[in-house]
């Protein structure tokens, strides 16, 4: 049984293509005999605090944190415990204005913590989150894979790698806003990528 943490960050609710892809992926795992323990974090509903100077320093261990900062530390610890307790991380990361949703960035700002999920050395940071693989489901209105306009892929690889998560796969649903056939073609291509992951 795999312990799966799902992060949904689309602002489109039930119309979200990344959430639909994740739900389909999980349903197919179940159909294939996997009895997974799944935790779903809807980051839009969670309304995570945005990193500012107060929270930044509190999460790095500053003395005498305010009540607000203490709540953020407790939340950060909870999110990190969920992450470290997982075997597989599924991330819904639609592209908004060439980048990840703010809600997803807020989650990473709470879990990427020095001395907790990574540590500094004399050369490079070393990740402290071990034994977890990740699959990112990313929908886009245009076609961006392999282009300078794709800031989503390098950012997610880098921030996951910072914490030690280096086994990362991507499922892209691209060109969804391109007429007349982009939507159907983009989802069909994502479907093929998902099939390859199940193989």
Swiss-Prot record:
Essential cofactor(s): FMN
Record field: catalytic activity: 2 a quinone + NADH + H(+) = 2 a 1,4-benzosemiquinone + NAD(+); N,N-dimethyl-1,4-phenylenediamine + anthranilate + 2 NAD(+) = 2-(4-dimethylaminophenyl)diazenylbenzoate + 2 NADH + 2 H(+)
Alphabetized GO MF terms: electron transfer activity; FMN binding; oxidoreductase activity, acting on NAD(P)H as acceptor; oxidoreductase activity, acting on NAD(P)H, quinone or similar compound as acceptor
Tagged with keyword Flavoprotein: yes
Gene3D superfamilies assigned to the protein according to its UniProt record, in alphabetical order: 3.40.50.360
Keywords: Flavoprotein, FMN, NAD, Oxidoreductase
Enzyme Commission no: 1.6.5.-, 1.7.1.17
Residues that, per the record, bind FMN: 10, 95-98, 139-142
Top EC class for this record: oxidoreductase
Top-level taxonomic group: Bacteria
Keyword NAD: yes
Entry's cofactor comment: Binds 1 FMN per subunit.
PANTHER family for this protein: FMN-DEPENDENT NADH-AZOREDUCTASE 1, FMN-DEPENDENT NADH:QUINONE OXIDOREDUCTASE
Subunit annotation: Homodimer.
HAMAP family to which the protein is assigned, alphabetical: Azoreductase_type1
Function statement: Quinone reductase that provides resistance to thiol-specific stress caused by electrophilic quinones.
Family: Belongs to the azoreductase type 1 family.
Protein name, entry field: FMN-dependent NADH:quinone oxidoreductase 4
Taxonomic classification: Bacteria, Pseudomonadati, Pseudomonadota, Betaproteobacteria, Burkholderiales
Gene (name only): azoR4
